Each structure stands twice: as structure tokens, then as C-alpha cells.
Amino acid sequence: MQNHVISLASAAERRAHIAATFGSRGIPFQFFDALMPSERLERAMAELVPGLSAHPYLSGVEKACFMSHAVLWEQALDEGVPYIAVFEDDVLLGEGAEQFLAEDTWLQERFDPDSAFVVRLETMFMHVLTSPSGVADYGGRAFPLLESEHCGTAGYIISRKAMRFFLDRFAVLPPERLHPVDLMMFGNPDDREGMPVCQLNPALCAQELHYAKFHDQNSALGSLIEHDRRLNRKQQWRDSPANTFKHRLIRALTKIGREREKRRQRREQLIGKIIVPFQ
């Protein structure tokens, strides 16, 4: 298995974390130098995802994260490999990860390398909907189909045909239809146009930040992307037509009723959903 870890060349602490995490399991890996806002990023966007450059709300860091995945896929396609495993440099690995990442016989026995597929290895500890896939369990983990949004791109396996699908799709989408790369891959299933995503359960990996949050612990590595997303949500609200005195007054007067309705909707949305565990 080719394991690629997206990481800034200057991120010494995170690279040391990855070297220890993968090295202690005997899992081979190679770093892929992540992009940052730069001329290199602008060239990559112009070549692969032209609509991204003009996106009004995604920050430079979010665009760089998006393009780091896209450029890595393009590199893998140029090399002619049938599939790759992709990780981000704040990932934690679960028990027996070497059974999945130090070999790939299990993958070849369960998936056609010439088909389009994604195996999501990560959990974000959010409620998700899955359905049976018919893929046989391996190493005490199942491969159900992901039927709802599940954020994050800290760990996944993607086939050559799936890489080509996403790159071709990203190349023609206008700015308003582009979102952070994790939502493009693992957001609304209808947006994937039939691209199957299997959600490993229990998950093989998790982002250190979200693992810490889920267990009420302090994060050792943090997340620049999370910070940028919070700022962008605030900016979108400030720029929204709904952010006028009249609309703010109406929202204040109807807040209790809206909160009650939101709670009802959340209860309905959680029916049948699970939190994918990490172990």
C-alpha cells in the first residue's frame, strides 16, 4: 500500500508525530509537501480546479488544503498506481492498523482496482447513516456504505478511477458549487453522483483534535483549518442579506420557537444514525 501523508515541509512537530505513529507499526509512508497560499497554489488551481481561485469565502489555507489532495491525486495518476492511501499529519491510528496499511492483499480481495471506490478510514465522531455494502469484514472491521455527510479527510483510500472522477468534476464546477475538499468527497451523497464510499467501522484513524474533543481532552496538535472555517462562517453571516436590523430583530423574537423546531429536527435526523467508533 502506498501511504501518503500530506504535511507542510516546515511542520517538524507533526512530522515527528507521523514518524513515530507509522514507524512504531512498521507501516511504510512518504510525506507529500502540502501547498500553502503561494504562486504554486495559484498555478495548481488554474490547472486543476479553476473555479476555486475565485471562491468568495474559502480562505487561502482551505484552498491550499483542497489543492494538496488534488495535486497528490494528479501525481498518483501520472505514476499509474491503482490506488493510494492518503492521510493528514494530525492523524491517530487504531489497533492493528498495520494489517490494513502495511499490505494491500485484503483490498484487492474486496475491491476491483479498476473500479471507482473510496474507503474512508476515519471517524469524526459525528452521527452518520450507513447501509450494508456486501463487502466482507476484515480485521474485525466492516465496510458499510456511507449514506450521509461525514466530514474530514484525515485518512482514506482512493482508487485511480475515483481520483479521475473527482478531478474531472472539480475542473468544471463554478465557484459557488465548490466547498472544502472533505465536503466534496464525503458531504451530501447525491453530490458524489453515485461514487461509492465505504466507511470502515470501527474506524482505523481519527484526527487528533477531534479525538481530544470527543474525550474532553486538550489537543496537542490543534488545527489551522478549523480556525479558518470558524472565521469564514462569521464572515459569511456578516455578508449575508439576512444580517440586517430587521432580520436580527425577527430572529431574536422567534428564537425560542426556532430552537424547539431545531431540536425536533435533530431528533428525527438521528434516527438510524450511529457514531462510528475509533479503536
Swiss-Prot record:
Enzyme class, broadest EC rank: transferase
Claim: Glycosyltransferase is one of the keywords in the record: yes
Documented EC number(s): 2.-.-.-
Protein's GO biological process: lipopolysaccharide biosynthetic process
InterPro entries, alphabetized: Glyco_trans_25
Keyword NAD: no
Gene Ontology MF term list: glycosyltransferase activity
Key words of the record: Glycosyltransferase, Lipopolysaccharide biosynthesis, Transferase
Transmembrane segments: none
Pathway: Glycan metabolism; lacto-N-neotetraose biosynthesis; Bacterial outer membrane biogenesis; lipooligosaccharide biosynthesis
Highest taxon above the source species: Bacteria
Entries under Pfam families matching the protein: Glyco_transf_25
Family membership noted in the UniProt record: Belongs to the glycosyltransferase 25 family.
Function: Adds the second galactose to the lacto-N-tetraose chain in lipooligosaccharide (LOS).
Protein name: Lacto-N-neotetraose biosynthesis glycosyltransferase LgtB
